UniProtKB/Swiss-Prot annotation:
Lineage: Eukaryota, Metazoa, Chordata, Craniata, Vertebrata
Protein name, UniProt field: EH domain-containing protein 2
Region (G2 motif): 91-92
GO MF, any single term: protein domain specific binding
Resulting phenotype, T72A: Incapable of binding membranes and localizing to caveolae
Organism field: Homo sapiens
SUPFAM superfamilies recorded: EF-hand, P-loop containing nucleoside triphosphate hydrolases
Motif KPF loop in this chain: 120-122
Length: 543
C-alpha cells in the first residue's frame, strides 16, 4: 500500500507524463483560453490570468483555522522541523500568511520581494496591496517533505468585527485566491474549544466551489475522553452542516497532530488510523498533480465561457447614444433574469454561473460601453479545447498514474509512521540512511544510563538476546508518544536492520525516547556518537 515510500530515482524529478500533461495544459491555456479571458476582461471580475509558475509549481496544501487550533504545530509535526520565523502558543501567534517552501538554506523572504519572483506562483497577489504583502512571507528550509509539496500557513481566524476590520486587507478574498490554486485545504478545529466564529464562517464561504479539496481535522482530540470526543464530533458535524453549502459530508480526521505524549491515550488506535488516512491523502498529491491542474483548468474554462456570454449580452443591450447610465442600472438589477435567460439559451448548468450578488457589485464599477460583443471564433476555440483537446490528454494522465509509483511525499512524519513494528501492513523494510562513517573510538553517550535500560530490556524477556518488534512496540507505545515519532526512533535504533533490538539498540531507543520526552528533536540521521560500539564496524561495512 505504501509502495511510493520506497526510494528510487532522482528525488524531486517529475515523471515524463506529468511534464507532458503540464506543458500541454500551458499551451492550451495560452492559445485557447487566455485570448477569451483578455477579450472579456475576466481578470477584472474573477481571478487574474495564470502564469507558467501556476502550472509548474509543486502541489500546495493550505492550512486554515481559528487561532490556537494548532496550525503551525501541525505543519511542524509534518516536517519534524521548526519553521523559520514561526511562533507557537495559546494566543494568536501567526499573524501573516506564510508559504513554507523548500530551500537550500533556512531563511525568510518578505512578501514584496516574493511577488516579483517569476519562479514563485505568487505574482498575482500584488493587487491585494501593501498591507497584505507586509503580512505575507515565505519560509524556506531544507526539508525532504518540502521537496514534494509546499504548505501555506494562515493567520489565526479571530472572532468579532473589530479584529476583522483591523486586518487592513480582504482576508476572505486572499483565502479564495489560494483556494483556487492549492491542491488540498485542511481546516483545523480544536476539540477542546469547538466554535465557528463569524469570520471563520465567512472564510469557509470563500472556499465555496472547492469543497472537493477540503479536509477537516479535529485536532487536540487527546485532550478529551472517548465519550466527550463523540459529543464533540457530533457538534462539529452539525456546525459544519450550517456553514458548508453542500449536501455531501466533509471528511473529518480525528487526532492529535504534534510530537508530544498523548494526554488521554484511550483513543490511540483511532488516532493512528486517522493519521494514516490523512497522510495517504497528502502523500498522493504529487501523483495526482497533473489531474488536479487539468480539473482546475476545465473549471476555469467553464466559468470563462459563462462570463463571455454575460458580458456580450450586457454589451448588446446597451443603447448606442442616450440613457446609458440608466440602462446600466436596469441591467444590473435584472442580472438574475439575465442569468436564467443565458442558461436556457446556451444550455449551461446553473453551477457554472458566478455568484449573482457579487457580480452585481463588480459590474457597478465598470463602463458597459467598453465591453465587447460576442466573438464566435474565440468561443469555438474554447469549446474545441473542452470537447477534444482535453479528452486527448486523458491517456497521458493514465500513463502518469502508472509511471508515478515512486513519486510521493517522503520524509518527516510521513516516514516515521511506517517504520519497523509501526508498519500497519507488511514486514519491515530496510532503508538506506546514508550516514557518514563513525569513529570506532568515540565514546558512546548512552553508556552512562545503559544499566538502567538493561534492566527494562531483560524484564521484557528477550529471545536469544534480542527483542522482537511486537515486544518492543508494546513498551514503546507506553511512552504515549505518537506512532510517527516512535517509528522514527525505531528506524534510528535498529542499526543492523534485522527488525529486532539487542540490548545496545534498545538502550539507544530508550535514550532517544527520553530525549524526545524532554522536548529535544530527533536527528535526521544517527550521529556517530550515538551508534552502538558493536555496530560501528558493521555499519561502516554496510555503507
Amino acid at each position: 500500500m505504501f509502495s511510493w515510500l520506497k526510494r528510487g530515482g532522482a528525488r524531486g524529478q517529475q515523471p515524463e507524463a506529468i511534464r507532458t500533461v503540464t506543458s500541454a495544459l500551458k499551451e492550451l491555456y495560452r492559445t485557447k483560453l487566455l485570448p477569451l479571458e483578455e477579450h472579456y476582461r475576466f481578470g477584472a471580475f474573477h481571478s487574474p490570468a495564470l502564469e507558467d509558475a501556476d502550472f509548474d509549481g509543486k502541489p500546495m496544501v493550505l492550512v486554515a483555522g481559528q487561532y490556537s487550533t494548532g496550525k503551525t504545530s501541525f505543519i511542524q509535526y509534518l516536517l519534524e522541523q521548526e519553521v523559520p520565523g514561526s511562533r507557537v502558543g495559546p494566543e494568536p501567534t501567526t499573524d501573516c500568511f506564510v508559504a513554507v517552501m523548500h530551500g537550500d538554506t533556512e531563511g525568510t523572504v518578505p512578501g514584496n520581494a516574493l511577488v516579483v519572483d517569476p519562479d514563485k506562483p505568487f505574482r498575482k497577489l500584488n493587487p491585494f496591496g501593501n498591507t497584505f504583502l507586509n503580512r505575507f512571507m515565505c519560509a524556506q528550509l531544507p526539508n525532504q517533505v518540502l521537496e514534494s509539496i509546499s504548505i501555506i500557513d494562515t493567520p489565526g481566524i479571530l472572532s468579532g468585527a473589530k479584529q476583522r476590520v483591523s486586518r487592513g486587507y480582504d482576508f476572505p478574498a486572499v483565502l479564495r485566491w489560494f483556494a483556487e490554486r492549492v491542491d488540498l485545504i485542511i481546516l483545523l478545529f480544536d476539540a477542546h474549544k469547538l466554535e465557528i466564529s463569524d469570520e471563520f464562517s465567512e472564510a469557509i464561504g470563500a472556499l465555496r466551489g472547492h469543497e472537493d479539496k477540503i479536509r477537516v481535522v479535529l485536532n487536540k482530540a487527546d485532550m478529551v475522553e472517548t465519550q466527550q470526543l463523540m459529543r464533540v464530533y457530533g457538534a462539529l458535524m452539525w456546525a459544519l452542516g450550517k456553514v458548508v453549502g453542500t449536501p455531501e459530508v466533509l471528511r473529518v480526521y480525528i487526532g492529535s497532530f504534534w510530537s508530544q505524549p498523548l494526554l488521554v491515550p484511550d483513543n490511540r488506535r483511532l488516532f493512528e488510523l486517522e493519521e494514516q488516512d490523512l497522510f495517504r491523502d497528502i502523500q498522493g498529491l504529487p501523483r495526482h498533480a497533473a489531474l488536479r491542474k487539468l480539473n482546475d483548468l476545465v473549471k476555469r474554462a467553464r466559468l470563462v465561457r459563462v462570463h463571455a456570454y454575460i458580458i456580450s449580452y450586457l454589451k448588446k443591450e446597451m443603447p448606442s447614444v442616450f440613457g446609458k447610465e440608466n440602462k446600466k442600472k436596469q441591467l444590473i438589477l435584472k442580472l438574475p433574469v439575465i442569468f436564467a435567460k443565458i442558461q436556457l439559451e446556451h444550455h449551461i448548468s446553473p453551477g457554472d454561473f458566478p455568484d449573482c450578488q457579487k457580480m452585481q457589485e463588480l459590474l457597478m464599477a465598470h463602463d458597459f460601453t467598453k465591453f465587447h460583443s460576442l466573438k464566435p471564433k474565440l468561443l469555438e476555440a474554447l469549446d474545441e479545447m473542452l470537447t477534444h483537446d482535453i479528452a486527448k490528454l486523458m491517456p497521458l494522465l493514465r500513463q502518469e498514474e502508472l509511471e508515478s509509483t515512486e513519486v510521493g511525499v517522503q520524509g518527516g512524519a510521513f516516514e516515521g509512521t511506517h517504520m519497523g513494528p509501526f508498519v500497519e501492513r507488511g514486514p519491515d523494510e530496510a532503508m538506506e540512511d546514508g550516514e557518514e562513517g563513525s569513529d570506532d573510538e568515540a565514546e558512546w553517550v548512552v553508556t552512562k544510563d545503559k544499566s538502567k535500560y538493561d534492566e527494562i530490556f531483560y524484564n521484557l524477556a528477550p529471545a536469544d538476546g534480542k527483542l522482537s518488534g511486537s515486544k518492543a512496540k508494546t513498551w514503546m507505545v507506553g511512552t504515549k508518544l505518537p506512532n510517527s515519532v516512535l517509528g522514527r526512533i525505531w528506524k534510528l535504533s535498529d542499526v543492523d536492520r534485522d527488525g529486532m533490538l539487542d540490548d545496545e539498540e534498545f538502550a539507544l531507543a530508550s535514550h532517544l525516547i527520553e530525549a524526545k520526552l524532554e522536548g529535544h528533536g530527533l536527528p535526521a540521521n544517527l550521529p556517530r556518537r550515538l551508534v552502538p560500539p558493536s555496530k560501528r564496524r558493521h555499519k561502516g561495512s554496510a555503507e
